[in-house]
């Protein structure tokens, strides 16, 4: 079955209301009707649910966009790409719930479509069926993130933001957890990576004009001023939109390796920079240090040949891991396809933080004391630390995953993970 058919089948099942509610400690999934409502047991306090703990998972399924009022699929044989991330995340969620069910985990899980026209996020968060929720997991956009963070703070329950790499202006909220590390954290990590591995090499940051690029430069400048180690001497070079290799070589040294930081999140800029540096790598040896968005770039293309590239990511799926192999085999056997990164993200976040909730016992205790527990690791070595934006008053603003993996590639092949 091709991926399109697989997702279409999943959409049909979701539109029929299947598995949007799950009592994980039972032997079956509760089948829902086409109204996609939640179970009446959600109105009861946790004690009435025989000790089960209530989890709310928010993700963009776009069911109302994909199906009309009669549950007819709107896109014929096509499958719009904007639906993929939410459905892939949902697949991982379902696999995690299967694993938790096998462990007899006492959970009461509710899944909400953040793109629902009849049940918007704000309405869900204030609804009777949301009452008693002890953990929020969300694949979100900024507006939704702020709503969920606000409710989490009011109810003293943790909210795990699994995808959005920004605090969205949220402060003074110890219930808010960012898993996808912020841009500043990536800059700090890349800076330390260069300090640790290339302390004597010349460093050049190539950038283009732009507000985002100014922010990146400000981060590196601030890190240079506050580092406890010997600061890097970064040379900043602003390039025109139509630059080529000749605009770069004057900043390179033919007698030693130059560390070239790509000071922009623009993927087109990244491709142009890598291609230009690759075209002169017989004369100028360089290591290109890129941004977290580079995971989406195909570096196997011939124009990048021979160029060493390093970029940071907070999520790394080790292909040698037994659970990873098991999930890959499941997808190969059942769907004739490979699981995406979002499948692993869905599995990891739901399994890990549900286990932490069960370990703590819920009841408004939060997860703060167990966020760093290594025994709950699934794929990623999360390093979830408190963030204090104002060091003068030391108010805890939120928690953030500070663990970064540094992926080194040559000709598109991973040659090292640090």
Where are these regions (language model features)?
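Extracellular/periplasmic periplasmic-binding protein-like sensory domains
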Residues: 274-345
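Signal peptide-proximal N-terminal region
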Residues: 77-109
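Short, well-structured alpha-helical segments in soluble
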Residues: 118-134, 246-255
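Segments of small-molecule ligand-sensing domains
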Residues: 336-340, 354-417
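Extracytoplasmic ligand/sensor domains, especially the bilobed periplasmic-binding protein
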Residues: 137-139, 144-206, 210-220, 298
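Sec-dependent signal peptide cleavage junction
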Residues: 18-54, 69
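Periplasmic-binding protein-like
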Residues: 131-141, 159-162, 202-208, 255-273, ...
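Bacterial Sec-dependent N-terminal signal peptides
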Residues: 1-27, 159, 205, 414-418
């Amino acid at each position: 079955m091709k991926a399109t058919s697989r997702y279409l089948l999943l959409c049909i099942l979701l539109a029929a209301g299947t598995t949007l509610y799950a009592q994980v400690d039972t032997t079956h999934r509760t089948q829902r009707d086409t109204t996609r409502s939640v179970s009446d047991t959600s109105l009861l306090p946790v004690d009435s649910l025989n000790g089960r703990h209530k989890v709310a998972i928010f993700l963009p399924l776009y069911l109302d966009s994909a199906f009309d009022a009669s549950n007819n699929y709107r896109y014929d044989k096509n499958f719009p790409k904007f639906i993929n991330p939410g459905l892939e995340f949902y697949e991982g969620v379902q696999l995690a719930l299967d694993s938790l069910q096998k462990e007899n985990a006492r959970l009461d899980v509710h899944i909400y479509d953040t793109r629902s026209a009849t049940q918007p996020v704000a309405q869900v968060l204030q609804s009777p069926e949301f009452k008693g929720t002890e953990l929020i997991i969300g694949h979100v956009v900024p507006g939704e993130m702020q709503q969920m963070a606000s409710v989490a703070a009011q109810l003293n329950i943790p909210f795990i933001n699994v995808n959005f790499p920004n605090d969205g202006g949220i402060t003074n909220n110890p219930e808010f957890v960012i898993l996808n590390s912020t841009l500043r954290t990536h800059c700090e990590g890349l800076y330390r990576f260069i300090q640790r591995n290339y302390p004597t090499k010349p460093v050049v940051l190539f950038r283009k004009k732009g507000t985002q690029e100014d922010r990146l430069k400000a981060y590196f400048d601030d890190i240079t001023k506050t580092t406890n180690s010997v600061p890097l001497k970064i040379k900043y070079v602003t390039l025109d939109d139509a630059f080529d290799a000749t605009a770069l070589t004057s900043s390179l040294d033919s007698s030693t390796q130059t560390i070239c930081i790509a000071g922009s999140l623009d993927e087109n800029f990244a491709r142009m920079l890598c291609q230009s540096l690759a075209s002169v790598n017989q004369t100028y040896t360089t290591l290109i240090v890129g941004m977290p968005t580079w995971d989406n770039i195909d570096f196997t293309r011939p124009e990048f040949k021979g160029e060493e590239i390093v970029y940071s990511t907070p999520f790394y799926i080790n292909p040698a891991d037994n659970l990873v192999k098991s999930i890959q085999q499941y997808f190969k056997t059942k769907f004739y396809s490979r699981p995406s990164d979002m499948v692993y993200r869905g599995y990891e976040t739901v399994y890990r933080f549900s286990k932490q909730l069960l370990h703590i016992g819920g009841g408004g205790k939060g997860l703060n004391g167990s966020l760093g527990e290594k025994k709950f690791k699934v794929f990623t070595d999360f390093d979830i630390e408190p963030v204090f934006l104002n060091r003068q008053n030391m108010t805890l603003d939120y928690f953030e995953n500070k663990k970064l993996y540094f992926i080194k590639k040559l000709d598109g092949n991973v040659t090292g993970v640090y």
